[in-house]
């Protein structure tokens, strides 16, 4: 058979078989199996070379924009309990100082400048720290008369190293919407620890008296005596008193049923209250003299553990200390502050020992995150030489006089005495602690009043 005829028969056979459905499916399956075998061969080769094929989902993740990857990384670095977008303690507008705490700060700050409150803080029974805690209790949404109301405070930030001097609960009584009217019997308000029969304090209200709004203050010092301090729950109760035995007019009218008691109608309801009218627990403590920087490091370390990121000092032993480095902006502020106030050499250093200006700006130090007031103050510093003969106003010690004399005879053998503060005074600071509580504290030795040679 010649070649043209063979080719013609082959074309005819192929066209005939192509019209059969089974031949098309067999061809597709054969192609798929070939592709699978090819892919398998490639996978084996990739595994040998340390490469793996990525699924479509993995490929999509690999194409994630850099910003998304950065957010995921930051989320992994965020401490437990801090959600994305949550502000660290002491930042933003979440903590609003209560007017009572602001008034305390203003009063004592003015008194410090006038020098009239020294005896208050030097007394053995007085406080140098005042901490405020805002009520965290929930509203009672029931429609029944509210005869008892609980107030809950988180006092875990109080240190057992501090001496408890006093504590008070401040409740703002709103003006009742309507007068009570008869009967003319007293109304008793009593404060107890929750689940305890211990009466902490009591007040008597006159329902027929003036219905002016104002603060009711209860002494709760006994309720805070048990330690350790974690949570403090206080319960306010109301009860009608007995008629006065001398009120003959009321008795002549006969027995009258008093209206049902409801703390809401008395002005003690929680609903529709601005922040400045919420219940406030004020604790007065006396702490031992403590180094400011040590105490602030503890405060910042606690705040960092509660959720601050990227701007607070790393806690000791932190496994990821690198992620808690100060922000570049804060480093620039500190560098600028150091360069502006760190030059103490040259001609001025040859002046005699005296007090020089030193303006402290807490914002430049990066402390404005948690310090409310003051944001700046004049600390002063001592600078100059202590050469022979020493002036009497420098109040030198006998040792400083001898040391200065030896230095004048042989400067190489004995260094000169140093120009240091001889009298320091305190300042008041209002700040936010690690629990987002507003704290007033008087810090000793913050302002140089006089300098001398020592």
From Swiss-Prot:
Cystine pairings recorded for this chain: 353-419, 382-451, 386-453
An annotated GO BP: positive regulation of DNA-templated transcription
Biased composition range(s): Basic residues: 329-350
Region (Disordered): 28-93, 247-268, 303-350
Compositionally biased region (Basic and acidic residues): 39-52, 60-73
Keywords: Apoptosis, Cleavage on pair of basic residues, Cytokine, Developmental protein, Disulfide bond, Glycoprotein, Growth factor, Secreted, Signal
Protein name: Growth/differentiation factor 6
Species whose genome carries this gene: Mus musculus
Organismal lineage: Eukaryota, Metazoa, Chordata, Craniata, Vertebrata
Gene behind the chain: Gdf6
């Amino acid at each position: 058979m010649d070649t043209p005829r063979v080719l013609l028969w082959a074309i005819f056979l192929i066209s005939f078989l192509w019209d059969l459905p089974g031949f098309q499916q067999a061809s597709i399956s054969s192609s798929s199996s070939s592709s699978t075998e090819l892919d398998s061969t490639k996978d084996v080769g990739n595994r040998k070379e340390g490469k793996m094929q990525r699924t479509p989902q993995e490929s999509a993740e690999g194409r994630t924009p850099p910003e998304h990857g950065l957010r995921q990384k930051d989320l992994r670095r965020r401490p437990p309990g801090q959600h994305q977008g949550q502000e660290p303690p002491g930042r933003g507008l979440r903590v609003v100082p209560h007017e009572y705490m602001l008034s305390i700060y203003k009063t004592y700050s003015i008194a410090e400048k006038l020098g009239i409150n020294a005896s208050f803080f030097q007394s053995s029974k007085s406080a140098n720290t005042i901490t405020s805690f805002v009520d965290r209790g929930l509203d009672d949404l029931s429609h029944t008369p509210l005869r008892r109301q609980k107030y809950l405070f988180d006092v875990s930030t109080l240190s057992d190293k501090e001496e408890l001097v006093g504590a008070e609960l401040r409740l703002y009584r709103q003006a009742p919407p309507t007068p009570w009217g008869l009967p003319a019997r007293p109304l008793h308000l009593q404060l107890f620890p929750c689940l305890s029969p211990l009466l902490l304090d009591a007040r008597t209200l006159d329902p027929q008296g003036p219905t002016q709004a104002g603060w009711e203050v209860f002494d709760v010092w006994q309720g805070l005596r048990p330690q350790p301090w974690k949570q403090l729950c206080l319960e306010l109760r109301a009860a009608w008193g007995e008629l006065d035995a001398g009120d003959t007019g009321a008795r002549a009218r006969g027995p009258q049923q008093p209206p049902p008691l409801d703390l809401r109608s008395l002005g003690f309801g929680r609903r529709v209250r601005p922040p400045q009218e919420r219940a406030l627990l004020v604790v007065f403590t006396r702490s031992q003299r403590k180094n400011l920087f040590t105490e602030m490091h503890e405060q910042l370390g606690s705040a960092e553990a509660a959720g601050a990121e990227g701007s607070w000092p790393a806690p000791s032993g932190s496994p990821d200390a690198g992620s808690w480095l100060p922000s570049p902006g804060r480093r620039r502020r500190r560098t600028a502050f150091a360069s502006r106030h760190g030059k103490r050499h040259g001609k001025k250093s040859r002046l005699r020992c005296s007090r020089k200006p030193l303006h402290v700006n807490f914002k430049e130090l990066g402390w404005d995150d948690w310090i409310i007031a003051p944001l700046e103050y004049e600390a002063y510093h001592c600078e100059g030489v202590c050469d022979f003969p020493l002036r009497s106003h420098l109040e030198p010690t006998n040792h400083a006089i001898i040391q200065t004399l030896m230095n004048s005879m042989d400067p190489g053998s004995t260094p000169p005495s140093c120009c240091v503060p001889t009298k320091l005074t305190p300042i008041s600071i209002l700040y936010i602690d690690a629990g987002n509580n507003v704290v007033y504290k008087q810090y000793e030795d913050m302002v140089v009043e006089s300098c001398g040679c020592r």
